[in-house]
């Protein structure tokens, strides 16, 4: 059963008057705001009547705006200490966590292990573009000069080419948005006297085969090198010297240890990086030419038909080789078929 509404006290009763016709109106009395009395516009309606009606105990007043202690502390912090983070008024990050011991910004104070990595400034990207495109320096040499990863240097050059092409085509650029974002991020400025390394450029990828422990018998008279260690883990494992993004730096450091003059070591390093990039460019050009030669083009008035020869037997050991015929259009995988092994059968 629903709860019964208790009777209201006598001091909160509504006085009803004999309202006749359309001349009656309802006016507020001196009772509380949620209690009102109905009185007639005639002078006789001001007399109290013997009929009294009990009012409901439900209140129609607005609830009091009572804040919890945590909410009060939150607004107090926003008005005092938090006001410094409301608007960005300086160059560089303005984060709540401040900076860590290594000088990197910490966005989240409760997670000091998450660091905000710096980005290349607009001037730094222009310097990289000029060194590669105007001065003709090899990409690996620019990467070693400014301690910027080779892939990042290549990305900067491509984006700069697009930007300059858009400027020539009079396309609008989001300059205000870029300035607002760059103003809030830590930046690396290249070319200055106190230039700092932007990132590590010789991080080596750890292959899963090299994480296991091996016991290899080696004679005392034999010199066990990094190439021998890589061959012990597998014939397809490359040594560390060949895994680096800029392996020419190893020979450069060896020349410095041999007390070769710095200018001579720099000249040899530039020649080695230029020869390496020329070899990569030649190999890529041959690959593209081979792909182009394998395609027969037949042009019509409306379309261009491209024919390429395929061997239907080259489908791989499971019939799903990525270079096989029809791989692009796909074959349904047997994942939902019965008697199919869906769990790994070996550990790699």
Curated annotation (Swiss-Prot):
Residues 37-63 are annotated as: Disordered. GO terms for molecular function: structural constituent of ribosome. It is found in: Mitochondrion. GO terms for cellular component: mitochondrial small ribosomal subunit. GO terms for biological process: mitochondrial translation. Coiled coil: none annotated. Residues 37-57 have a biased composition (Low complexity). Keywords: Mitochondrion. The keyword Mitochondrion applies. Its main location: mitochondrion. Belongs to the mitochondrion-specific ribosomal protein mS45 family. PANTHER family: 37S RIBOSOMAL PROTEIN S35, MITOCHONDRIAL, SMALL RIBOSOMAL SUBUNIT PROTEIN MS45. Component of the mitochondrial small ribosomal subunit (mt-SSU). Mature N.crassa 74S mitochondrial ribosomes consist of a small (37S) and a large (54S) subunit. The 37S small subunit contains a 16S ribosomal RNA (16S mt-rRNA) and 32 different proteins. The 54S large subunit contains a 23S rRNA (23S mt-rRNA) and 42 different proteins. Component of the mitochondrial ribosome (mitoribosome), a dedicated translation machinery responsible for the synthesis of mitochondrial genome-encoded proteins, including at least some of the essential transmembrane subunits of the mitochondrial respiratory chain. The mitoribosomes are attached to the mitochondrial inner membrane and translation products are cotranslationally integrated into the membrane. This is Small ribosomal subunit protein mS45. The gene is mrps35.
């Amino acid at each position: 059963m629903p709860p019964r509404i208790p009777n209201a006290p006598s001091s909160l009763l509504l006085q009803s008057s004999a309202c006749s016709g359309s001349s009656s109106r309802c006016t507020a009395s001196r009772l509380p705001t949620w209690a009102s009395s109905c009185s007639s516009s005639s002078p006789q309606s001001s007399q109290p009547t013997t009929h009294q009606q009990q009012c409901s105990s439900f209140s129609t007043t607005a609830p009091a705006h009572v804040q919890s202690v945590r909410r009060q502390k939150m607004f107090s912090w926003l008005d005092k200490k938090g006001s410094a983070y409301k608007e960005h008024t300086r160059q560089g990050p303005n984060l709540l966590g401040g900076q860590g011991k290594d000088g990197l910004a910490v966005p989240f104070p409760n997670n000091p292990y998450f660091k905000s990595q710096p980005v290349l400034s607009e001037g730094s990207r222009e310097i990289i573009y000029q060194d590669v495109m105007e001065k003709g320096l090899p990409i690996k040499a620019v990467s070693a000069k400014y301690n910027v990863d080779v892939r990042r240097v290549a990305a900067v050059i491509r984006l700069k080419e697009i930007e300059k092409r858009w400027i020539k085509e009079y396309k609008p650029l989001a300059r205000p948005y870029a300035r607002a974002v760059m103003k809030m991020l830590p930046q690396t400025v290249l070319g200055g006297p106190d230039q700092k390394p932007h990132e590590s450029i010789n991080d080596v990828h750890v292959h899963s085969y090299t994480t296991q422990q091996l016991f290899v018998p080696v004679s005392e008279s034999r010199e066990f090198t990094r190439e021998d260690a890589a061959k012990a883990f597998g014939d397809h494992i490359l040594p560390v010297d060949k895994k680096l993004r800029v392996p020419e730096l190893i020979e450069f450091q060896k020349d410095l240890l041999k007390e070769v003059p710095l200018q001579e070591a720099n000249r040899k390093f530039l020649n080695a990086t230029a020869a390496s990039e020329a070899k990569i460019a030649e190999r890529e050009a041959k690959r593209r030419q081979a792909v182009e030669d394998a395609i027969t083009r037949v042009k019509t008035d409306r379309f261009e038909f491209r024919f390429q020869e395929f061997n239907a037997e080259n489908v791989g050991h499971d019939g799903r080789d990525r270079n096989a015929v029809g791989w692009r259009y796909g074959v349904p995988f047997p994942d939902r078929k019965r008697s199919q092994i869906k769990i790994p059968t070996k550990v790699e």
